[in-house]
Design a protein with these regions (language model features):
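Motif-centric detector for short Cys/His coordination patterns
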Residues: 1-108
Length: 108
């Protein structure tokens, strides 16, 4: 899938990320989901099982940095910043946010 963001901004004092893609899809993705589903190796379990990240309901996005033409890095209020969020990943998170959050809450 080739999707490109036309607009990307943190909103609601950093509690959400709004992304508008070139196919006109607009998503508001909560910071909690972005943090607990971070694509970083330590969260995704590249060196062991996937970690369940707890107590991130009040997490906020501090800063967004563009990585080339394909992704962003998000710096969160807990200092986590090692995940690289590709455009495709953000689109997937936006499209499947409710399901991903339900799965996360069920795992707690």
């Amino acid at each position: 899938m080739n999707c490109w963001p036309l607009s990307l901004e943190k909103i609601d004092q950093g509690k959400n990320l709004r992304v508008i893609f070139d196919d006109k899809m607009e998503f508001v993705i909560c910071a909690e989901l972005l943090r607990v589903e971070s694509p970083s190796a330590d969260v995704q379990g590249h060196s062991g099982p996937k970690k369940i990240i707890k107590n991130k309901k009040d997490i906020i996005i501090i800063k967004i940095e563009q990585i080339g033409n394909y992704a962003i890095r998000i710096i969160f209020s807990d200092d986590h910043s090692s995940g690289i969020y590709t455009w495709e990943l953000l689109y997937n998170y936006g499209k499947n946010q409710q399901k991903l959050l339900k799965n996360y809450y069920d795992s707690l």
